[in-house]
């Protein structure tokens, strides 16, 4: 138990905010954080990441963005488009997490060719799209956010992306189990386990994006988390 606490992080360092559980939860979580991490209401300035790190209040972000809003939809669609453009123009970049090019990483992780990826991801993940055809059969492509998309966003904004998952120590069975988050509140005993740090070269230069990834209804789901003290959060989590 002591080792578990030492290797995990108190969730009270953050304010947790869920987004709707659709195919675009990754992009929606990023959209909410973009709005939080800039002081501007003008979406053009938000989309240019002006004054990144001069944060808005979480109350204001939750009021404007919440689980779903038109502003969120706008920003989520924008950031997905930026990712597609970056991938198209940097397909040979080496992804540190795989040691392979972005193109080959797409084949490994998404099981798509580059051309398929560019075509499918050109459709916003939040849009219902059941009319695509493969060998005369309808199918649906899950445009989920993987380490590829995390890496690209880190490059676009020039900031780290730090991803946690939620864990809980089960004292009855003396084992670690998945931790639940209900109504943006962690279940008693739930702590955050560092899962990935993307864009380590940007640590200390720009405010990171903080996310939680967890299983939800047997699928992956992203939540956004806002540091309660942005200026000290990295030292508090020992990064």
Regions found by a protein language model. Name each.
Residues 118-239:
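Deubiquitinase catalytic domains
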